[in-house]
């Protein structure tokens, strides 16, 4: 049997085109591809990404799916993704029904796991797989080949019986995770992604190498914790934590390194390290493999404060090539952390950051605001912690989201904050909820402004580029050609440790005036968040410049003291052309100022008005 597996289109509902690196490729598809191929069947992959030659994402997806169906004539089509992929999956199923109405569709992934009855009944694929799908997809293929319809014999399967949805018995006693075949990325064009689109990955996954080739690996499944915002809630059938043996992980790393010659390894696990002993075991094995095979790559991982990683363990990790590790800090308020069921303390975060700074390892902190316990006081606590510890580290700031499968989602349903599921899924990646104790007029302007400033302001230390020239050897980069950018070779001395760094970045040409057009990310996103605050349709936010200016004046007229917490994000200096990266030696966050034209008066005007009116 021939099976076509279709990846979701990255940021399908947010803006086309959005270039997509292999670090965003869902590994679940690669595991499914491997299981199907190892059972003796053919696998064809379709990766509808990184093709900007269409008017819209839908037009691109329509053409790609239509061509693939005509060329490959599959016997079964597999779709999957997360809740944010709802619109893509809905459109993909409609296209398949139009072009190949007799070909069965099976849907899997997080989107089906946590709201199975609604998603299956709404999107109406022929089958759905709940939970891990490697064995189930093979059993389904065997059943389809036999011509039988004894679907009740297959656990964790959804199907249709006389027009009604039916779901078989549940069995989540999975096989030993070490017995899983390694993922097969080849059907999805990963080699081309490494060659052409590695620069599309976020900077924290590529800054250590001028020619980055990042690769991902998953060494465990599930999570032993049960944070309220996580899809693995306390009573979830899918949260059981299972980790692979270090020996098994090393075997996959060797296979990937020999095949793809990566130089940055991203360990994607929600929780790679549950205790420091496992990290030590991994580091010792990695050091041995480095010496034995001549490996040369940097790596990054995620852990939890309760893993109790100490100075000696992180020192060993650095020796083994680790350049950064991640905590989901979320909040520095004990009250909010308790409400989130994080089981962690701000003192643990501070200790970890201090150790990382001492050793010269990067620290990536994720903050999410908007928990049900969030108040003005808790925001002040978190922003005070941010100001003290986080100005020189990698950070992300976001609003908390009630994703299906989380306790927050259940709470929002009960409270009526989510009253129309179809509308919720349609705008799942475009909406922010107010679950806090704050009034809407304060919460929405504050969180949008916080996210905006954290992305575009120069609050980290800055340094001037000492060298900036065109890289003539990489003038045909696909991303550069589309955006009319140029690949530059850049040198800069770190403002923290004074060491010289060498980067390659896609930038606007020096010969062109450095002016942001109406399509610039900075001003489009700024106008977008203003229109969202006003509750207007985002599609119409360019209709009136006067309206935007008026909304901006309305926003900054808020003199609520909460806005003063944004001071650390504003930075000390005027905005100049720069890019955000990290030092390749001490791994602290830095901004590299560029010798380009500086016509950024619009952004500086915004910044000045914010500082004057909000008085920060």
Regions found by a protein language model. Name each.
Residues 2-3, 42, 213-216, 499:
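Residues that mark the start of a beta-strand
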Residues 38, 76-78, 106, 250, ...:
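Conserved C-terminal portion of the radical SAM core fold
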Residues 4-15, 158-161, 165-172, 204-205, ...:
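C-terminal accessory regions of radical SAM enzymes
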């Amino acid at each position: 049997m021939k099976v076509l597996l279709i990846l979701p289109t990255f940021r399908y509902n947010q803006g086309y085109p959005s270039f997509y690196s292999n670090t965003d490729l869902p590994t679940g598809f690669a595991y499914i591809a491997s299981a199907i191929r190892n059972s003796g069947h053919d696998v064809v992959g379709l990766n509808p990404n990184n093709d900007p030659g269409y008017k819209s994402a839908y037009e691109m997806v329509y053409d790609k799916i239509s061509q693939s169906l005509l060329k490959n004539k599959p016997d079964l089509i597999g779709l999957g993704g997360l809740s944010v992929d709802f619109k893509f999956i809905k459109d993909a199923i409609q296209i398949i029904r139009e072009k190949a109405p007799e070909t069965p569709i099976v849907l899997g992934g997080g989107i089906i796991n946590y709201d199975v009855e609604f998603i299956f009944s709404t999107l109406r694929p022929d089958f759905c797989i709940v939970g891990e799908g490697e064995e189930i997809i093979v059993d389904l293929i065997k059943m389809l080949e036999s011509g039988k319809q004894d679907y009740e014999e297959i656990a964790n399967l959804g199907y249709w019986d006389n027009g009604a949805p039916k779901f078989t018995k549940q069995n989540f006693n999975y096989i030993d995770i070490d017995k899983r075949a390694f993922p097969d990325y080849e059907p999805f064009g990963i080699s081309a992604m490494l060659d052409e689109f590695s620069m599309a990955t976020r900077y924290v996954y590529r800054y250590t190498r001028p020619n980055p080739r990042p690769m991902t690996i998953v060494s465990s499944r599930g999570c032993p914790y049960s944070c309220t915002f996580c899809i693995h809630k306390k009573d979830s059938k899918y949260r059981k934590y299972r980790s692979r043996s270090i020996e098994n992980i090393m075997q996959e790393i060797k296979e990937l390194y020999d095949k793809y010659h990566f130089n940055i390894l991203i360990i994607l696990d929600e929780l790679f390290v549950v205790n420091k002993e496992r990290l030590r075991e991994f580091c010792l094995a990695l050091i041995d493999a480095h010496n034995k095979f001549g490996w040369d790559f940097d790596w990054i991982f995620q852990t939890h404060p309760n893993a109790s990683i100490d100075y000696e363990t992180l020192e060993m990790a650095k020796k083994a090539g680790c350049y950064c590790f991640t905590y989901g800090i979320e909040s520095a308020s004990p009250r909010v952390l308790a409400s989130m069921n994080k089981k962690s303390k701000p003192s643990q975060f501070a200790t970890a950051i201090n150790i990382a700074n001492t050793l010269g390892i990067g620290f990536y902190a994720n903050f999410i605001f908007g928990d049900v316990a969030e108040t003005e006081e808790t925001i002040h606590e978190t922003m005070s912690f941010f100001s003290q510890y986080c100005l020189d580290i990698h950070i992300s700031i976001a609003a908390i989201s009630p994703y299906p499968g989380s306790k927050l989602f259940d709470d929002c349903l009960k409270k009526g904050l989510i009253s129309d599921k179809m509308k919720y899924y349609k705008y799942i990646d475009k909406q922010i909820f107010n679950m806090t104790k704050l009034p809407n007029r304060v919460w929405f302007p504050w969180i949008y402004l916080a996210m905006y400033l954290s992305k575009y302001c120069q609050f980290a230390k800055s340094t001037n580029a000492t060298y900036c020239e065109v890289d003539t050897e990489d003038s045909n980069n696909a991303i550069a050609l589309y955006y009319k950018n140029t690949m530059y070779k850049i040198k800069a001395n770190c403002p923290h440790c004074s060491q010289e760094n060498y980067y390659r970045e896609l930038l606007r040409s020096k010969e062109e005036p450095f002016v942001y057009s109406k399509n610039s990310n900075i001003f489009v996103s700024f106008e977008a968040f203003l229109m969202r605050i006003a509750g207007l349709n985002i599609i119409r936010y360019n209709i009136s410049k006067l309206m935007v200016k008026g909304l901006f004046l309305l926003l900054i007229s808020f003199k609520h003291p909460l806005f003063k917490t944004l001071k650390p994000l504003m930075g000390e200096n005027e905005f100049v052309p720069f890019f955000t990266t990290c030092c390749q030696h001490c791994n602290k966050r830095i901004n590299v100022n560029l010798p380009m034209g500086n016509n950024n008066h619009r952004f500086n005007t915004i910044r000045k008005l914010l500082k004057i009116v909000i008085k920060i």
